[in-house]
A protein has these predicted regions:
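Cytosolic, long alpha-helical scaffolding segments
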Residues: 1-221
Length: 221
């Protein structure tokens, strides 16, 4: 039978995975909507995000209660503190996703074909983000196999690196188009800004992975 510390830590992990599941569903809905440039579907993307702040706050309150009542040992305490940071990052990711979909209002049936093409190319970033979310879920649920945990962190880093490369190619493409047109195109400038902001999501996931490594294996942040 699990002691109270272990029992509550299992609950913290499970609740955190629930939030990550919501974020993953939202990302997949966003991907489907943007693949079709179907702005009518954008509102559906926000539905899984509506309860994330409450869920994150509930996790924080649970952690603080455990720390106050049960005096967890150093290893458990380290993981509890890591999850306080993780829930904060997850709330920011939810905000990033909402803002991203608001910005992607430029993807609609009236958008010019060049904008639609660039947005569809940028969705490779979203696919990397979905993979990183799934790896993060696995990192949280894997509590014993340290090699597997390190491997999952490495996979998240690979996905992060891919998104950097994808953005660099998109930026180069749009700058080349403006050069050929001999003018600054505000739509392209904004599009680069929106796509760059979308990178913050996977950046936060990489930070979460680092915190999980610190909590489970140790080292420095």
């Amino acid at each position: 039978m699990l002691d109270k510390n272990a029992e509550k830590l299992v609950e913290v992990r499970a609740r955190t995975v629930e939030i990550l599941d919501d974020l993953t569903i939202s990302q997949k809905l966003a991907l489907q909507a943007l693949e079709k440039c179907d702005s009518k579907s954008f509102e559906q993307v926000k539905v899984p995000l509506k309860t994330i702040n409450k869920k994150a706050n509930d996790i924080d309150n649970l952690i603080l209660t455990v720390c106050a009542l049960y005096s967890p040992e150093a290893k458990d305490l380290r993981e509890m503190i890591a999850f306080l940071k993780i829930t904060s990052a997850l709330q920011r990711i939810a905000t990033n996703e909402k803002n991203y979909m608001k910005n992607m209002g430029i993807c609609n049936p009236e958008s010019n074909e060049e904008v639609k093409r660039v947005i569809k190319e940028s969705l490779a970033i979203n696919r990397c983000t979905i993979k990183a979310l799934e790896y993060t879920i696995e990192m949280i649920t894997e509590t014993e196999d340290k090699d597997r945990i390190k491997d999952l962190e490495a996979k998240i880093s690979v996905e992060y690196s891919k998104t950097d490369d994808i953005y660099s190619m998109i930026e180069k493409d749009l700058l080349q188009l403006m050069h050929e047109d001999h003018q600054v195109n505000d739509v392209y400038i904004n599009l680069m800004k929106y796509i760059r902001k979308n990178l913050k999501i996977i950046d936060r996931l990489e930070d979460i992975a680092s915190r999980l490594i610190f909590a489970r294996i140790g080292g420095t942040l």
